């Protein structure tokens, strides 16, 4: 099978193909960020990098059997302020559709898989009309400990959401975390990277860990092994959130926290890899910095979801 991966990132698509038990003859990728490319090359030395997606022409490629990609989503996401197709990053979707159309002219049986964030219906409709397939909504929480709703467009036959594996945060957390330098406050220990404003959202009262919310009750109780989101400590409408037994959706900053044994902390890089169902140390290969690894993981795919989709190729 010859595969073309656009906006390839850290080549989670290649990993998912292997997880699905599929043989890859050639894997060609388009990626422009240095750190993800270094991680990809360290894990998959045979990947052929093609450069900027805007310069790729079907006439220059061998026969392609499968095109995959997750065009940049910042313009569709809440974090990207919902700029939609006016955001040049999200407009790169049309490069994906252009290349698919060009390749179909040479191979009418071409298969594709496109991933993006959950978005407004009117934007989803544009992609659906362009790709001429109905979207499939899958939450990574079915196969991981991460709440990550995503939308997929594919013409691979028979794709359905995977069965729930009932994976909880407690299943993927590292057991021994160095708490040296942690801050004691309100009867809890806090990761020092958590700001004072964010820490003020968390209190321990009557044996409960309470996360302040802009609700009538004023808080929600977090239990051991719950994910916490303290990213908006000054917001009058959002404030803190609790995700029961799961992490929040990872993004390029991976700012979510977890409550474990009276400690409120950020996830380790290994835990972030596990939340995306990557092998431990996958992003350590290639020499990327910790910050680059975190960004690459948050921008990537949940490998187990993609593998379930690819299993329909057998």
What role is predicted for each listed range?
Residues 1-314:
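Conserved active-site and SAM-binding loop architecture
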């Amino acid at each position: 099978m010859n595969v073309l991966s656009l906006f390839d990132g850290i080549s989670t698509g290649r990993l998912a193909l292997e997880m699905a038990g599929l043989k890859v003859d050639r894997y060609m990728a388009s990626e422009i960020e240095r750190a993800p490319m270094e991680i990809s090359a360290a894990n998959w030395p045979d990947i052929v990098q093609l450069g900027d997606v805007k310069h790729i022409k079907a006439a220059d490629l061998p026969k392609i059997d499968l095109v995959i990609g997750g065009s940049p989503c910042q313009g569709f996401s809440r974090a990207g302020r919902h700029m939609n197709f006016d955001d040049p990053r999200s407009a790169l979707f049309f490069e994906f559709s252009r290349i698919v159309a060009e390749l179909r002219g040479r191979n009418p049986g071409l298969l594709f898989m496109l991933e993006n964030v959950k978005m407004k219906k009117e934007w989803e409709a544009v992609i659906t009309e362009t790709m001429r397939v109905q979207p499939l909504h899958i939450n990574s929480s079915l196969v991981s400990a991460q709440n990550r709703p995503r939308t997929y467009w594919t013409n691979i036959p028979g794709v359905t959401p995977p069965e729930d594996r009932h994976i909880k945060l407690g299943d993927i957390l590292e057991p021994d975390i160095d708490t040296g330098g942690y801050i004691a406050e309100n009867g809890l220990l806090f990761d020092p990277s958590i700001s004072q404003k964010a820490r003020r959202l968390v209190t321990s009262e009557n044996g409960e860990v309470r996360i302040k919310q802009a609700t009538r009750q004023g808080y929600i109780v977090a239990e051991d092994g719950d994910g916490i989101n303290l990213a908006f400590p000054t917001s009058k409408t959002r404030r803190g959130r609790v995700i029961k037994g799961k992490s929040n959706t990872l993004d390029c900053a991976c700012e979510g926290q977890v409550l474990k044994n009276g400690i409120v902390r950020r996830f380790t890089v290994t835990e972030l890899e596990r939340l995306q169902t990557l092998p431990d140390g996958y992003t350590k290969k290639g020499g990327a910095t910790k910050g680059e690894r975190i960004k690459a993981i948050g921008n990537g795919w949940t490998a187990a979801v993609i593998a379930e989709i690819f299993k329909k190729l057998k």
